[in-house]
């Protein structure tokens, strides 16, 4: 889908660049496939802010998206493509031959009327699901499982994909968008194709109010605060902080590694950080 620009009638319109969503379904989602969504405003169960700069925004309905695709060898027809406010990608409503419906992540080049299927050996075409070990090397994939049967976790955002670049005994090697190469078990499943809405990265918010509609509050810098609020706060006039960048709680930021899941390090063949050096 193409990008839309607008006549510069206001500064916000001048800067605004949106994805053209005119080809998407304009009605309401299937009620049986939705849930109510409570807005947390960045607060946890004790009412304290755990994620800063969140709150407000338009009320959203949660669409239940099928990331597992575990109806094996049951063809489904794409009924329509829909907008989903909870994610950057578009979703597709599919209907199985037994009459059940489901939402799936819409890949690029998936159209209304297309047939998709999940199985051990299926055609290599967008929207089909199969175990990674049965895919040909070089296949572009998304919605990739990391644990067998858990459902897709990798490459689910708009325009993202990974590539299957090799095999190693029971495992396959996939290359992610970040440049990281990692081992995933061959019985884990993935969906063929790249995720829809690749133009999302080229959009421009246009004005501050549009961020508020999305539930994002203004992000204040530490150096503009008082000393009570941030380690970088205070000083006469504008200052540069006077120390290496830290979080509001005094921990180093901007580059300090925070990954602690050492048990899965053995599956990372090429770190995304090594590539950048």
UniProtKB/Swiss-Prot annotation:
This is Large ribosomal subunit protein uL2. Keywords: Ribonucleoprotein, Ribosomal protein, RNA-binding, rRNA-binding. GO terms for biological process: cytoplasmic translation. GO terms for molecular function: RNA binding; rRNA binding; structural constituent of ribosome; transferase activity. Part of the 50S ribosomal subunit. Forms a bridge to the 30S subunit in the 70S ribosome. GO terms for cellular component: cytosolic large ribosomal subunit. It comes from the Bacteria. Belongs to the universal ribosomal protein uL2 family. Residues 199-277 are annotated as: Disordered. One of the primary rRNA binding proteins. Required for association of the 30S and 50S subunits to form the 70S ribosome, for tRNA binding and peptide bond formation. It has been suggested to have peptidyltransferase activity; this is somewhat controversial. Makes several contacts with the 16S rRNA in the 70S ribosome. Residues 209-220 have a biased composition (Basic residues).
């Amino acid at each position: 889908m193409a990008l839309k620009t607008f006549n510069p009638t206001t500064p916000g319109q001048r800067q605004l660049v949106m994805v053209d969503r005119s080809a998407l379904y304009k009605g309401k989602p299937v009620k049986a496939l939705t849930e109510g969504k409570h807005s947390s405003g960045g607060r946890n169960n004790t009412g304290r802010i755990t994620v800063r700069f969140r709150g407000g925004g338009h009320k959203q309905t949660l669409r239940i998206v099928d990331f597992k695709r575990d109806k094996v060898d049951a063809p489904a027809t794409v009924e329509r493509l829909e907008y989903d406010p909870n994610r950057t990608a578009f979703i597709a409503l599919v209907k199985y031959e037994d009459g059940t419906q489901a939402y799936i992540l819409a890949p690029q080049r998936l159209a209304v009327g297309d047939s998709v299927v999940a199985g051990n050996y299926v055609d290599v075409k967008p929207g089909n699901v199969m175990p990674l070990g049965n895919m040909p090397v070089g296949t572009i994939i998304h919605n990739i499982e990391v644990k067998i049967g858990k459902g897709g976790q990798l490459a689910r955002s708009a325009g993202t994909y990974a590539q299957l670049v090799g095999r190693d005994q029971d495992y396959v090697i996939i290359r992610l968008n970040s440049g990281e190469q990692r081992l995933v078990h061959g019985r884990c499943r993935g969906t063929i194709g790249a995720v829809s809405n690749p133009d999302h990265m080229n959009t421009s918010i246009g004005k501050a109010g549009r961020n508020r509609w999305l539930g994002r509050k203004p992000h204040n810098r530490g150096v503009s605060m008082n000393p009570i609020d941030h380690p970088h706060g205070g000083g006469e006039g504008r200052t540069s902080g006077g120390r290496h960048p830290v979080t509001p709680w005094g921990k180093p930021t901007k580059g300090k590694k925070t990954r602690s899941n050492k048990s899965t390090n053995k599956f990372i063949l090429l770190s995304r950080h090594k590539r950048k050096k």
